[in-house]
Amino acid sequence: MKHSLSQATRAAAVALTLFSASAALAQRDAAMAGEEQHTASGLLVRQGEGSFAPLVFDPDKAPFGLRNNNWVAIKGPNLSGKWPGQTGANTHGFARFDDPAYAIRSFIELMWIYQDRHNARSATDILKRYSPAGDCSGAPSLPPRERREGGGCIENQTTAPITAMRVARAVGLRPTDNLDLFGPDGQINHPDRLRTLIDAVVTQEVGASHCPQPPRGESWIGCRVDDGLYNRAVELLTRMPG
């Protein structure tokens, strides 16, 4: 067959199909058991055939980010401050929002701060700062007493180099290349690259329990923010003074 899939590609396709099938079965079983199911409005999850559908979750079993509209696992801007729209934080500083658009808005602002103040311009530099080794989003995979300072959850260890590779590959750059996300006044230069960065971070921080993780070498991303929510986040950002 002239255009036959490579063994690695077939394996990746099978893995994604199995993930989607198991997720669908879990969702069906939860519904049959009468478990409460919520839809993460504005968050889409990749299906086995490559399409995207709204992400549905059980709030009693979901990671912190889904339960608290903080899909990017952003922390408060400092020890006592709050981002616009932030309603609180957990003991590790991860923010809670009533509206996920505010979390995405805050993430975009933070990316601009990284570029403007710290000259973090590549996927590698950005994610090493945003996701330091050993940190995590606080997903409930370990009881609080067993989590180390800063999060400490097994299922969702941050892996900045892997996430940086996913971002770079998805936009056709190397992990150390300048993403050129913002102009000198903070205007967004490349919305496609910024959105890929957001989606890769969401995929990593929400975790494999709800977002399929692409195998090494693959350029697809498991969860993405839909157009409406992204546009609302940008609008919220442009309304802010300064």
Q: How should each PLM-predicted stretch be described?
A:
Residues 2-12:
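Bacterial N-terminal signal peptides that target proteins for export
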Residues 7-9, 22-25:
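Intrinsically disordered, low-complexity serine/threonine-rich segments
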Residues 11-20:
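Bacterial N-terminal signal peptides
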Residues 26-242:
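Cell-wall polysaccharide-cleaving catalytic domain and substrate-binding groove, primarily
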